[in-house]
């Protein structure tokens, strides 16, 4: 399995706009964490960006998971960039 990092952006006013979708979003993340696919995920201070580490077979599978997330579908996340990652330490 390879590791991938996500670097993305939130829409303006994300803290308020995400509220109706937050429970669904967190449930999906919890399931990915339990499966071992999601290592960690969270916003930067001020909630302008999102960072995550995934473990998966391919970048395409990580992108597919992210595109299913309600935050992406509802425009809370506005850009998602996924990169292969080599952990040095």
Regions of interest found by a model, annotated:
Residues 1-89:
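Conserved, structured core segments of small domains
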């Amino acid at each position: 399995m390879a590791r991938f990092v996500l670097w993305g952006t939130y829409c303006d006013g994300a803290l308020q706009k995400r509220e109706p979708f937050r429970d669904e979003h967190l449930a999906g993340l919890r399931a990915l964490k339990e499966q071992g696919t999601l290592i960690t995920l969270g916003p930067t201070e001020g909630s302008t960006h999102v960072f995550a580490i995934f473990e998966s077979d391919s970048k395409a599978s990580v992108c597919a998971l992210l595109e299913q997330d309600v935050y992406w579908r509802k425009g809370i996340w506005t850009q998602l960039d996924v990169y292969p990652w080599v952990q040095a330490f």
